[in-house]
Design a protein with these regions (language model features):
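Small-residue-rich segments of transmembrane alpha-helices in multi-pass membrane proteins
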Residues: 15-24, 82-89, 98-99, 147-161, ...
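Interfacial loop-to-helix junctions that mark the boundaries of transmembrane helices
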Residues: 43-53, 88-92, 109-121, 141-145, ...
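Long, contiguous bundles of hydrophobic transmembrane helices that form the permeation core
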Residues: 60-111, 118-121
Length: 303
């Protein structure tokens, strides 16, 4: 494994790929898409439309990671390199948690009645915690510290960002967004510096308002922000929804605060003794020179 040579860039590329870009296909991959699913976007709707752009983005990031990793390995002193090349022995414990993971995934498809979905997810997570042997938690350095840290941070972010997003919801149509690429870069820019989940919701609302203004007859009888209105939007302007989805998910990787899991990964890695870039080091050393050009190119090619 990589435990003898894990570096800051391993954490960064994990955030790029696993916490963000990798989850762009379905609602269980990233929080914004799950919110879209709750608002009326069918589960596999996005998968059918973004697979190529997702594949190109992920492949480009993985190619850059491969170059980083090869260079890092080549620069290692001989003794650590010999340790890294030796076959590791490992064992799999806590297999019961696969069952609970499947329960949580299955709960996504439950009807939203009396918070049944959320109750099943919470029950599965709680049961998993108490049934997992404490030795497994100890070996994996499990603690609630990163979860608490992220919770407090994003309470502050949500509190301060709501006025800006509220203004966007009311006056967004005045900006004249009429092309998918505008939605891609605008939702991406805000997702990079704010949390991408509420940003997605606001731009989905903006897309609906724009489409409603262009063709009010198509939205007749559908309340603003309703499931019916979102489903009409999927027919009238599917490219807008694709652009907002990709912008929110992809650009959420630009900073630690762009997506909730980003900061959690950083906190877990830090607690495990792994060196992580600072907030601005992450941006100026990795996301701006590496990720941003890839996302711009993908937007120009596919959105």
């Amino acid at each position: 494994m990589n435990k003898v040579r894990i570096s800051a860039f391993h954490v960064v590329f994990f955030i790029f790929i696993v916490s963000n870009v990798g989850g762009a296909l379905t609602p269980i991959g990233d929080p914004p898409l799950f919110i879209g699913y709750l608002r009326g976007v069918p589960f596999f709707w996005l998968l059918e439309r973004v697979f190529t752009s997702w594949l190109v983005t992920a492949a480009a990031i993985l190619a850059v990671f491969y170059c980083f990793d090869r260079r890092s390995f080549a620069r290692m002193p001989r003794a650590p390199r010999a340790d890294a090349e030796q076959a590791d022995t490992w064992r799999f414990e806590g297999g019961i948690n696969i069952l609970f993971l499947l329960v949580i995934i299955g709960a996504v498809f439950l009807p939203d009645t009396f918070f049944l979905r959320e109750a099943v997810m919470l029950a599965a997570a709680t049961t998993s915690y108490f049934l997992t042997p404490k030795t497994v938690h100890a070996v994996n350095s499990f603690s609630f510290g990163p979860i608490k840290e992220v919770a407090f941070l994003f309470i502050g972010i949500f509190t301060t960002m709501m006025p800006a997003l509220g203004y966007l919801a009311v006056h967004g149509v005045e900006f004249g967004f009429t092309r998918p690429l505008q939605y891609y870069f605008a939702s991406g820019a805000l997702s990079a510096v704010l949390d991408n989940a509420p940003t997605y919701v606001n731009f989905l609302q903006l897309a609906e308002s724009t489409a409603r203004a262009a063709n009010p007859a198509a939205f007749a009888g559908a309340a603003v922000g309703s499931v019916a209105a979102v489903q009409i939007l999927l027919v009238q302007q599917p490219a807008f929804v694709v652009a907002v989805s990709l912008g929110a998910v992809f650009f959420g990787a630009m900073t630690y605060i762009g997506n909730g899991p980003n900061f959690m990964v950083k906190s877990i890695a830090h607690d495990a003794g792994v060196h992580c870039p600072s907030f601005f080091g992450y941006i100026f050393k990795y996301s701006l020179p590496i990720l941003l050009p890839i996302l711009i190119l993908v937007g120009l090619l596919f959105v």
